[in-house]
UniProtKB/Swiss-Prot annotation:
The modification N6-(pyridoxal phosphate)lysine is found at K193. PANTHER family: 2-AMINOETHYLPHOSPHONATE--PYRUVATE TRANSAMINASE (PTHR42778:SF1). Homodimer. It comes from Vibrio cholerae serotype O1 (strain ATCC 39315 / El Tor Inaba N16961). This is 2-aminoethylphosphonate--pyruvate transaminase. It catalyses: (2-aminoethyl)phosphonate + pyruvate = phosphonoacetaldehyde + L-alanine. The gene is phnW. The lineage of its organism: Bacteria, Pseudomonadati, Pseudomonadota, Gammaproteobacteria, Vibrionales. GO terms for molecular function: 2-aminoethylphosphonate-pyruvate transaminase activity. Its cofactor is pyridoxal 5'-phosphate. GO terms for biological process: organic phosphonate catabolic process. Its EC number is 2.6.1.37. Belongs to the class-V pyridoxal-phosphate-dependent aminotransferase family. PhnW subfamily. Pfam families: Aminotran_5 (PF00266). Involved in phosphonate degradation. Keywords: Aminotransferase, Pyridoxal phosphate, Pyruvate, Transferase.
């Protein structure tokens, strides 16, 4: 079945027809052909994609990507631990909010939504606040499309003996990285992002030695990362509670398609080509990106809304949707913007078609 429109969003995103077709069969969650041949293969493939180093393992967790973030924060931190959160967007802020809900001591460095964190400030905070045990940062902050300097932040954290939690929700699978080389202790992502699966579960790739220490720490039964991992380890991929079977099977297919494309490096190149073409074309149409080019990720781009008095995002959105494209509203608190993603089953020819559709959607210039 073909889609009526292309999702130019940071996830859920447009998937291939073969990924969607993978969900047309039912699976028994007790059978080896599901647990051993799908779930366990997924777990191994994820670790291989994340790092060339040994000592890492993976665990899948039902729910949204945020559920996996909360499972990690809530299962990793001791009552005496303290979290430093780098917050330059809605998703960094969400990590701090999770810590607040769970009564976890938290300190926040917030440089603003359009600025990268100051590395000297991070080092200074870690030097003068020895209570901090963990540092959390978002890799691609889709509030704006900014790519944060995770290598530099992780290096500083490790120099101060801290554990690092990386929210790679919108980057893993689409941007090359080796979390072992970076010193990441826990990395979190989701099925419906750069791997190009469908929503339904997230996953955590962690140092085995760190995850082994998390027994009994969880503040939630459902979101107990350690118990979920132990269940999968001891029962060959079995989930503690109902497994999202159709989503899992679609994700397995998406992983195969990532390999067929040439792996993460090839997918990154496609995303980068999409984003470069998008920004060039949008500039030619009179739209200005929110961020300077050096801060852009290849995942999603924020553009300032036109200042014309007749412009309304809802009308603009509908005119694009009628032509087969769905974009995202803005999320920046201090600027009127909209966002366009270029991940998922999106290719340069799709960006070309979008730019053509844009010319017909700019109704405020046609009056």
């Amino acid at each position: 079945m073909k889609n009526a429109y292309l999702l130019l969003t940071p996830g859920p995103l447009s998937t291939s027809e073969s990924v969607r077709e993978a969900m047309l069969k039912d699976w028994c969650t007790w059978d080896d052909d599901y647990n051993l041949e799908i779930v366990e293969v997924i777990r191994r493939k994820l670790v291989t994609l994340a790092t060339t180093q040994s000592g890492y393992t993976s665990v899948l967790m039902q729910g949204s990507g945020t559920a996996s973030v909360e499972a990690t924060i809530g299962s990793v931190m001791l009552p005496t631990d303290k979290l430093l959160v780098i917050d330059n967007g809605a998703y960094g802020a969400r990590i701090a909010q999770i810590a607040q809900y769970l009564n976890i001591a938290c300190r926040v460095i917030a440089p603003g939504e359009t600025a990268q964190p100051n590395l000297d400030e991070i080092a200074d905070v870690l030097t003068h606040d020895p209570a901090i045990t963990h540092v959390a940062i978002v890799h691609c902050e889709t509030t704006t499309g900014m790519l944060n300097p995770i290598a530099e932040v992780a290096k500083i954290a490790k120099q101060h003996g801290k554990r690092v939690i990386l929210d790679a929700m919108s980057s893993f699978g689409g941007i090359p990285m080796d979390i072992g080389a970076l010193g990441i202790d826990f990395m979190i992502s989701s099925a419906n992002k750069c791997i190009q699966g469908v929503p339904g579960f997230g996953f955590v790739i962690a140092k085995r030695s760190e995850l082994e220490q998390c027994q009994g720490r969880a503040r939630s039964l459902t979101l107990d990362l350690f118990d979920q991992w132990q269940c999968m380890e001891k029962n060959h991929g079995k989930w503690r509670f109902t497994s999202p079977t159709h989503t899992v099977r679609a994700f397995y297919q998406a992983l195969l398609e990532l390999e067929s494309e040439g792996g993460i490096a090839a997918r990154y190149q496609r995303y980068q080509t999409n984003q470069t073409q998008l920004v060039k074309g949008m500039r030619e149409l009179g739209f200005a990106p929110l961020l300077p080019e050096k801060l852009h990720s290849p995942i999603i781009t924020s553009f300032y809304s036109p200042e014309h008095s007749d412009y309304q995002f809802a009308e603009f959105y509908q005119r694009l949707k009628q032509q087969g494209f769905v974009i995202y509203p803005g999320k920046v608190s201090h600027a009127d913007c909209f966002r366009i993603g270029n991940i998922g089953e999106v290719y340069p020819q799709d960006i070309e078609r979008l730019l053509s559709a844009m010319q017909h959607a700019i109704y405020w210039q046609q009056a």
